[in-house]
Design a protein with these regions (language model features):
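A short, highly charged nucleic-acid-interacting micro-segment common to nuclease
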Residues: 1-11, 29-32
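Conserved catalytic cores of phosphodiester-cleaving nucleases, focusing on short active-site segments
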Residues: 14, 42-44, 54-61
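A short, glycine/Asx- and small/polar-enriched loop/turn
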Residues: 35-39
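Acidic, metal/cofactor-coordinating or nucleic-acid-engaging core segments within structured domains
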Residues: 70-152, 156, 161-165
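Extended, charged low-complexity segments
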Residues: 146-212
């Protein structure tokens, strides 16, 4: 269940921060809640750094930050292995069978040319969302602060000290150095309690299904 909420957050961040529209997502490919789709957690297409870009996203929510990064990179690596061409072709084919409503006719035609092999003029980007538990967040709530800005400043300092960039870099160098030549854009969300957060998101989206 965590994966579904992660996919929703991934979609929000990619469209909100990178301005790359979603072309299809795994949730929409399922015929019923028990179906399991072995693919990316979201496909996006748009302009990034001035070039046409295909985004293949991953969303992970883990208790441990390092585990979340490792699993996200492992999932991303599937699109650059021995059978990556076939896998990527499958992603595009399935996505075109369930395009997002926000795609214009022109973009749908362009995407069609991508998976038919008529055009390869695009770059690939991997937007990656990792939600993780941070035990220190509870402590921040017990300290007195003069105002909200002081709390924000302290949280920002704490996240900087977590050194997320180094954690990603170390994981890449140890097991996935070949991924360094590709665009990888990480979005991190520290959580006090992952399961509680997931339930809150579920309650906000589907209030009538929440257990009390």
């Amino acid at each position: 269940m965590d994966g579904k909420r992660g996919e929703l957050i991934l979609f929000t961040m990619v469209e909100g921060f990178l301005d790359i529209p979603m072309m299809s997502h795994k949730l929409g490919w399922k015929q019923n809640p028990t179906d399991q789709i072995k693919g990316s957690d979201g496909l996006f297409f748009g302009e990034y750094e001035g070039s046409p870009t295909l985004g293949i996203g991953e969303a992970k929510m883990y208790t441990d930050l390092d585990d979340g990064i490792e699993e996200a990179l492992d999932s991303t690596d599937r699109f650059h292995g021995e059978d990556s061409q076939l896998r990527n072709q499958h992603e595009l084919t399935v996505a075109m069978g369930n395009p997002s409503d926000n795609l214009s006719k022109e973009k749908i035609e362009l995407l069609s040319s991508l998976f038919t092999g008529e055009s390869q003029d695009y770059q690939m980007l991997h937007p990656i969302f990792v939600g993780y538990e941070d035990d220190d967040l509870e402590e921040f709530q017990t300290k007195p602060y003069e105002d909200d800005q002081e709390l924000v400043d302290q949280l920002q300092k704490h996240i900087e000290e977590t050194d997320l960039l180094s954690k990603v870099t170390d994981s890449l160098e140890e097991d996935y150095s070949h991924l360094r030549k590709h665009w990888l854009t990480f979005f991190f969300l520290p959580l006090e309690d992952k399961d509680h957060f997931v339930e809150n998101v579920k309650a906000a989206i589907y209030p009538w299904t929440t257990n009390h």
